[in-house]
């Protein structure tokens, strides 16, 4: 059957989800039944001369029927538990919490279908179909990042992808010392400081030239346990995901090597502070292993200025200083699709609004994306590696993380070959297991991601439209909150937003007018969370659901102080409380970009919040 390409603007997102009220439920069932029937037929048609091992007589036996009934009872219990205790994040406009939402129907169907084969993508021989799909997905990741010779693969989640990124950086940074030991002519004339500040491309070029001695050089690298502290500091923004600390622990460089970089009042890495740290370390002859920039921070959705991190590196190279750059775009990575045309070209900023209008990316023609965010996304192509999670803004079921590398040759620095699953030098169509951290991995995940990418291309015509819906929905929610006040008994409760969203996350607080006690405000917001989550009972009957987080001094320093001051709290009060508690909405719903639809839900949300505040203040 021919796969017809849709014309510009024809992609209808409403056809790709089961739907808030299961509007496409019958379509999902029909497609699933067709796929299951195909699998059953595939089983039946293999070696038709073989007789069935489960006989008709067996299927009518008493023990068989009892076993089937027992299985049904277990499944009924699972159904009861799932329906009773699950979070209804499929809802169009009532869930405003974690990074979860509707999942794409083609991804669900592909996962349902492929899991019947139970492929293990660690080895091609156990999963020929899905291993090839994963290899294609990896190249699609690379194209999304504008990597010309890149490579990528699926991992279980962003934490493992971050660990793998640090693994790459650690091993690459240590290679010059290994070359000095094994083949010193490769780095002749370089001081130890110069060896510690060699650009990644130069290192990979030298490694490639070593030919037959590559394995010996690798054996003398950081994988041997040598040079782990000597290779330098790992710099992360204060908005870092906690997985970076775990990665430093596991990878062996240690937590003492991790330095948090302050963020500005927009919760983006402060580039001036970054430069101070790097130059200060250089004065003490301490190298920087690498710098992490975040695109879509976990708690604010902030987009670090990747372009400025790269520009600073370029400037520092004049002084003989170099660092590896990893972009943690676990949340925001798929957002790059909104900037790519159908030929994978990065759209000029001055043309962006017109192109978005042409493809129906946004309902309203205006500046939805700032120049700062645009420049940050464009510069991702200059970073060595990127974390990207399909199970976040890819709208793909868990678990599906991903990592992408700029230069396919980099994968050799972490490769291991086990003869029983992959033979070194063998001509295997899709060799994954030798170049990844994980062992066994679900082929169904690869099929799920592959299906999503082929229904929704990774450009403005496909995922760009889905990402745009999310961004526009977040702007509606942000504007709605900014206009909110509540009369609760004799109290007036104001709503204040943290920052205008860089991407699609909205953080906000409730504040009692006239209150100058930050601890009391924090308690109010925690109480709102309790009433808007599983904490206070059956979440299925909750009319508004959200999440929360704390911005505390040990993690954020004084970055939240400007926001805290804007609420009327003094510096002394900030120091006394030590944190500010905010409510957090990752606005992933694909339905709230339509202002008319949002306006249907807005009074419902307001009424639900009014009720929760009255419960908190015990207003009868």
Swiss-Prot record:
Catalytic activity entry: L-tyrosine + H(+) = tyramine + CO2; L-dopa + H(+) = dopamine + CO2
Superkingdom assignment: Bacteria
Residues found modified as N6-(pyridoxal phosphate)lysine: 392
Metabolic or biological pathway: Amino-acid metabolism
Activity control, per UniProt: Levodopa decarboxylation is not inhibited by carbidopa, benserazide, and methyldopa, that are three human L-dopa decarboxylase inhibitors.
Cofactor(s) this protein requires: pyridoxal 5'-phosphate
Enzyme class label: lyase
Keywords: Coiled coil, Decarboxylase, Lyase, Pyridoxal phosphate, Stress response
KW Lyase (keyword) present: yes
Signal peptide residues on this chain, from the entry's feature table: none
Binding positions for pyridoxal 5'-phosphate per the UniProt entry: 158-159, 298, 389-391, 440
Subunit composition and interactions: Homodimer.
Family: Belongs to the group II decarboxylase family. Tyrosine decarboxylase subfamily.
Protein name: L-tyrosine decarboxylase
Native source organism of the sequence: Enterococcus faecalis (strain ATCC 700802 / V583)
